[in-house]
Amino acid sequence: MPDAAPRLKGLVEQMVGAPLPLRIRAWDGSEAGPPTAPTLVVRNRRALRRLLWKPGELGLARAWVAGDLDIDGDLYTALDLLAGIVWERGEDARTLAQALRDPEVRSAVRGLLRLAGPPLPPAPPREEARRPRRHLHTRSTDRRAISHHYDVGNDFYEIVLGPSMVYSCAYWPAPDSTLETAQRDKLELVCRKLALKPGQRLLDVGCGWGSLAIHAAREHGATVVGVTLSQEQAAYARKRVADEGLTDKAEIRVQDYRDVRDGPYDAISSIGMAEHVGAERYLEYATDLHRLLRPGGRLLNHQIARRPQRDESRYEVDAFIDSYVFPDGELQPIGMTVTQLERAGFEVRDVESIREHYALTLRRWVANLEADWGRATQLTGPGRARVWRLYMAASALAFEHNRIGVNQVLAVKTPESGMSGMPLRARTWN
């Protein structure tokens, strides 16, 4: 009689010391667990070997990406429930070592090893990037990291992002608004915060597929230079600019922001790009942007932030994100971002948290992906599509639960006269 699921349920509960909140369906067809809960589908024994070899986030991610694990039921509910039984990120080795001192845990591990069977360990899925020992953030490593994430295929991104082709947090007038409306409102918000006027020069750092460059040129009469490290993004953005008849107003370059030399600019936007800069390079990033602005020019820095830790020296990047999504990416608390911008010479004038907006945005992206799943897997492969579904759904929950946030920081290169040019009443953005 098939019994893998009840055996697995019992061993996991013995290990974690609590009831398993998910239902399990095992490779032999057996099921166990709460009948109304989402079902964790364990397709083969290899899934157990992945989790035993990397007991935590990375092992779970490898099993998911390879298709060894799946969820039958609401993905968001399942991820919330799983979060309570996965080893704490950044604490895997120490937490497991402490847990193994318990005879019950050791007995459960032995039982799981017998159930998993040989061999150990399975090779990581091919979608996993090679992780450097440390985050170098040289021009070459940044270029490779950007290519891993953004050169997946423009057709795939069209499915996920929709017609707006904006890959950053939208700005929602209401939860039931369309994604396209919310993204247009975000682009307009950025332009108003920068107080763009006809003829002014805007540098868009990390310009993506050109949406902000087009909006700023078409709606505000700005002359825009957009820079990206992604060849695919640049080709797509250039075609969009040409189709809009804006080639005299918007230029798209494949260029590192550190190599831009044609300042000064009246304004700089950096939307969802600074997460790739790295903590060690952040002051250099801020200093370079300060150098490129004219006195009185404004910077709008839109960036995801993590929560600060009591001991920052022990902070470790998310293993799944670093291996499968944003190799070499780093988040830092908003306080560190503001400090580094001011160290570079900026005067920070406004910080707006739009955390809930990103949760709404991510849920729409997941819905877009799921609605065209068959074509998405044809375009990029099932493993890569599974990476994206997991990463976006988990990120939506992280924003909803206040584990991470996103902020727009408006800063000014204030002239020696001290006249910032900002309105007396904040957030009128005139």
Language-model regions, residue ranges each:
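Substrate-binding/catalytic lobe of Class I Rossmann-like enzymes that use SAM or dcSAM, i.e.
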Residues: 304-419, 426-429
